[in-house]
Amino acid sequence: MFIVIEGCEGSGKSSLTQLLKDKLMAEGKAVVATREPGGSSLGERVRDWILDPSTTELSPYTELFLFLAARAQHITEKILPALELGKIVVCDRFHDSTIVYQGIVGGLGKEYVTNLCHSVVGQKKILPNLTCLLDIPADEGLKRKQQQKSFDKFENQSLAYHTKIREGFLSLAESRLDSYLVLDARQPIEESLNKVMTAYTELALCKSKER
């Protein structure tokens, strides 16, 4: 099973990813937790470069295709092998971050970027079984980030930018009610974890009945 955690800056994605991994492993499940950009040696190098605030010369298309290249390697090197072994993969960001950041808000077009994202998964159709969106007002998410000593390229963007990011994620969630779980990131993270576990259990039960 493939579970993706999405959300705006400061929503708690990384924390929920780790908590979910720990919870599933405590129940005896084989779990791989990973992130995007990243997840492979190539992906981590792309992450360091693109997110560096000093990297300002990239065109929107260059940025997009670097993200897609990192994802292609991530799928080949980590995600697909884990899924084929029957493991649960929990990923901090995936396709929808690219669709929102580069397509909807970045101006490259939702449909154009969506089609490119789908082309990256190839014939195996590596798509999430469940996407969990940690939703939080942009200003509150950015306040959480103020505790950091440094900020990456996207975290440095304006409040208006991050508000559009939130709206983009919510619009995707509304169009995919069958596979999206929207969580209030202002609630205790343990509550979000419990809701994700409930959704996972229901999904796992449905998949077992299909066999």
Curated annotation (Swiss-Prot):
Gene3D superfamilies: P-loop containing nucleotide triphosphate hydrolases. It is an enzyme of class 2 (transferase). CDD domains: TMPK. ATP binds at G7, C8, E9, G10, S11, G12, K13, S14. It comes from the Bacteria. The keyword Translocase does not apply. Keywords: ATP-binding, Kinase, Nucleotide biosynthesis, Nucleotide-binding, Transferase. The keyword Nucleotide-binding applies. It catalyses: dTMP + ATP = dTDP + ADP. GO terms for biological process: dTDP biosynthetic process; dTTP biosynthetic process; dUDP biosynthetic process. InterPro entries: P-loop_NTPase, Thymidylate_kin-like_dom, Thymidylate_kin_CS, Thymidylate_kinase. Pfam families: Thymidylate_kin (PF02223). One of its GO terms (molecular function) is dTMP kinase activity. GO terms for cellular component: cytosol. Its EC number is 2.7.4.9. Phosphorylation of dTMP to form dTDP in both de novo and salvage pathways of dTTP synthesis. This is Thymidylate kinase. The lineage of its organism: Bacteria, Pseudomonadati, Chlamydiota, Chlamydiia, Chlamydiales. The gene is tmk.
